[in-house]
Swiss-Prot record:
PANTHER family reported for this sequence: GTP CYCLOHYDROLASE MPTA
Name of this protein: GTP cyclohydrolase FolE2
Pfam families named in the record: GCHY-1 (PF02649)
Organism of origin: Xanthomonas axonopodis pv. citri (strain 306)
Biological role stated in the UniProt entry: Converts GTP to 7,8-dihydroneopterin triphosphate.
Chain's gene name: folE2
Gene3D superfamilies: Urate Oxidase
Catalytic activity: GTP + H2O = 7,8-dihydroneopterin 3'-triphosphate + formate + H(+)
Record-listed E.C. numbers: 3.5.4.16
One GO-annotated biological process of the protein: tetrahydrofolate biosynthetic process
Highest taxon listed in the record's lineage: Bacteria
Single Gene Ontology MF annotation: GTP cyclohydrolase I activity
Keywords, in A-Z order: Hydrolase
Pathway the protein contributes to: Cofactor biosynthesis; 7,8-dihydroneopterin triphosphate biosynthesis; 7,8-dihydroneopterin triphosphate from GTP: step 1/1
Record family assignment: Belongs to the GTP cyclohydrolase IV family.
């Protein structure tokens, strides 16, 4: 038996000579770690390099996998991702590769406290997508998160208030004054005469990290977005928390345009390039309402909803 195994990627030329923009692997199951000593997260990775040499049959995919596996044993950081991309390029010097790209997708689990109940908290999952690319010695890293929130329609709220006030006037026609306790009792009995429609909504936010970024700062981006929206969905709730959530929704009525603009302002203060896509899963309509915005000079494409 021959001790040498055949390697057609090296020994056989391509019968259809052409350079390839990207070649590699997709949907690789691999664990990642966000901080030193933290738990590992199940992730999916894609990794590719370019193949400028038209006559070569293919790249060395095992090299990509081994480098990915080795580097991802370290906590995720902009520096580590940049080192990994350069190592991928260097590993394919015989292919004249000049560019590499990597994507990572996973869910970040965060424990969030209840709005009112002391000591009560629950877990929420945030989909995270990282896209890193190195070309001509320049590395760019994009970070995308998904945040769930509630949206109560301001138009529907106005219509509901009108119906409620009309019902009050009709029932108390001819009376100029009413005891306060009677008004309170009427509101208790009829306050839900009409209610505005609200729904679970989703915001996908993508940012490009500054070139000098030391950390991915995923949790900080989540907090920035949830603070701007003001009505993030809750995990563990009791009645006081549900009441507080109802109050937040009443104080933060928003249509899809409002939500997109709420996110745009703080993102513009922290990132030079960003893109926002929001979607309200309408309870009134059989379709969704959507809006997008982004930085004027953003090189980021539309987010996939």
């Amino acid at each position: 038996m021959s001790p040498t195994l055949p390697d057609v990627a090296v020994t056989e030329p391509s019968t259809l000579s052409a350079p390839l923009r990207w070649v590699g692997m997709q949907d690789i199951a691999i664990p990642v770690q966000l901080e030193t000593g933290s738990s590992q997260l199940a992730a999916r990775a894609s990794v590719q390099v370019d193949l400028p040499r038209a006559e070569l049959k293919g790249i060395h995919m095992s090299r990509l996998y081994r480098l990915l596996d080795t580097h991802l044993q370290q906590p995720l950081s902009p520096a580590m991702l940049s080192q990994l991309l350069q190592a991928l390029i260097d590993s394919h010097a015989d292919c004249a590769s000049r560019a590499a790209r990597l994507t990572l997708s996973f869910e970040l689990m965060l424990r969030t406290p209840a709005l009112r109940s002391e000591g009560l908290s629950g877990w929420r999952a945030y989909p995270v997508h990282i896209a890193a690319q190195c070309r001509a010695g320049r590395t760019t890293i994009q970070l995308q998160i998904e945040v769930l929130y509630a949206s109560t329609c301001p138009c529907s709220a106005a219509l509901s208030r009108q119906l409620l006030s009309d019902a009050f006037v009709q029932q108390h026609a001819g009376r100029d004054t009413l005891p306060l306790r009677d008004v309170v009792q009427w509101l208790q009995d009829h306050g839900t005469y009409a209610t505005p429609h609200s729904q679970r909504s989703v915001a996908q936010v993508r940012v490009e990290l500054p070139a000098d970024a030391q950390r991915l700062a995923i949790q900080q981006l989540v907090g920035l977005c949830e603070q701007a929206l003001a009505t993030p969905v809750q995990a563990a709730v009791r009645r006081p928390d549900e009441q507080a959530f109802a109050r937040l929704n009443g104080a933060n009525l928003m249509c899809v345009e409002d939500a997109a603009r709420r996110l745009r302002k703080p993102l513009a203060e922290h990132y030079a390039a960003f893109h926002v896509a929001v979607r309200h899963l309408e309870s009134l309509h059989a379709h969704d309402a959507v809006a997008e915005t982004g930085s004027d000079d953003a090189v980021l494409g539309p987010t996939t909803m």
